[in-house]
Amino acid sequence: MQKKTLSDITIQGKRVLMRVDFNVPLDGNGEITDDKRIVEALPSIRKVLDNGGRLILMSHLGRPKGKVNPDFSLTPVALRLSELIDTPVIMAGDCIGTEVMQQALALQDGEVLLLENLRFHPEEEANDPEFSRELASLGEIYVNDAFGTAHRAHASTEGITHFVQTAVAGYLIEKELMYLGKALQSPERPFVAILGGSKISGKIDVIDNLFSKVDTVLVGGAMVFTFFKAQGLETGRSLVEDNKTELALELLAKAKSMGVRLILPEDVMAAPEISPDAPFHAVSVDQLAENEMGVDIGPKTAETYRKEILGAKTVLWNGPMGVFEIDNFAGGTIAVAEALAAATAKGATTIIGGGDSAAAVAKAGLADKMTHISTGGGASLEFLEGKELPGIAALNG
């Protein structure tokens, strides 16, 4: 998927309208608790400013439901960004309108204007053409660097491209496409995918798409219990999708017919309930008691998975191995993260598919030990499902 990028265009003296993902977490006092998403946009931002562009940034924050809500203002982001780039950031009062247009036209080379939250307008998520046209009129060049919203056809990601001549990818999107795209198109082998999370239904399209690309699939998370139920094992009080047992059997058969090794846990951690104080112990998957639930993969499985990961040249991880938010049930997830870090050190390409997996890697303190951590949970999932992302399809090829 070759797309033109920031490196392909002339920026000097031009108004560059850039869609970024500044959807950062705020605490009760409106302070940013994690500025990772702002930091990730810096390479593209610096490229525009260093090359004498006039930068207009736009983003959403939270879910204000199409109404102005001061709790979701991007003002804290403007303050943090100005600290990071050591340049004043002008904060607009809105994202469209006469006043904003005047601010955009008044920008000098190397100056930055941050538009107010796009989702204060219902037209943003509705991909309204008139709203898209108004946004587009602010800039001369459009750059999308918000991979996290690339799977949404919104005004600022898709609609806007109908009203601009130049629409290119920023460096963050370029990096995402490079790593995720290479993994799916020409991976170094062996290629191992680790899939976790609670439901088969949420991962069915990913599993299906990956079967034609990977050598091995390691399964963890609560979705393993739907497989076990399908195989006639006791699953106790574990989370099971009863209406997906046939599907689980079909997936096992399909893996076999396609020559993919689909590996399920041999042991799990069992507990009477999901609580930090609950007693827990390892049991073989055929020994789970009726009054217990599986909350993590067991130590034998963690060791098997570690060996598989260390033998791989490309590893893709999407979804935790257990209820990792509770320390006692995070062992399997941490073990996988540690194995990925070791594989990376050995020269493997390791890709973390955003969302919970990224949080798990951060919890293990190993974020800087992976080849690539995707910034888009939903977007990376849809990309792995083989779907076209509207925000990327809309850019100039």
Curated annotation (Swiss-Prot):
Q: In which pathway does it act?
A: Carbohydrate degradation; glycolysis; pyruvate from D-glyceraldehyde 3-phosphate: step 2/5
What residues bind substrate, as annotated? Answer: 21-23, 37, 60-63, 119, 152
Q: Which domain of life is it from?
A: Bacteria
Q: Name one GO biological process term.
A: gluconeogenesis
Name one molecular function that GO assigns to this entry: ADP binding
Among Pfam families, the record links this protein to: PGK (PF00162)
Question: According to its UniProt record, which reaction does this protein catalyse?
Answer: (2R)-3-phosphoglycerate + ATP = (2R)-3-phospho-glyceroyl phosphate + ADP
Give the EC number(s) listed in the UniProt record.
Answer: 2.7.2.3
Keyword rRNA-binding assigned? no
Query: Where does this one sit in the cell?
Result: Cytoplasm
Carries keyword Cytoplasm?
yes
Q: Can you tell me which residues bind ATP?
A: 203, 294, 325, 354-357
Record key words, sorted: ATP-binding, Cytoplasm, Glycolysis, Kinase, Nucleotide-binding, Transferase
Gene Ontology cellular-component terms listed: cytosol
Q: Which family does it belong to?
A: Belongs to the phosphoglycerate kinase family.
On subunit structure and binding partners, the annotation says:
Monomer.
PANTHER family to which the protein is assigned, alphabetical:
PHOSPHOGLYCERATE KINASE, PHOSPHOGLYCERATE KINASE 1, CHLOROPLASTIC-RELATED
According to UniProt, the name of this protein is Phosphoglycerate kinase
Native organism: Chlorobium luteolum (strain DSM 273 / BCRC 81028 / 2530)
Give the organism's phylogenetic lineage: Bacteria, Pseudomonadati, Chlorobiota, Chlorobiia, Chlorobiales
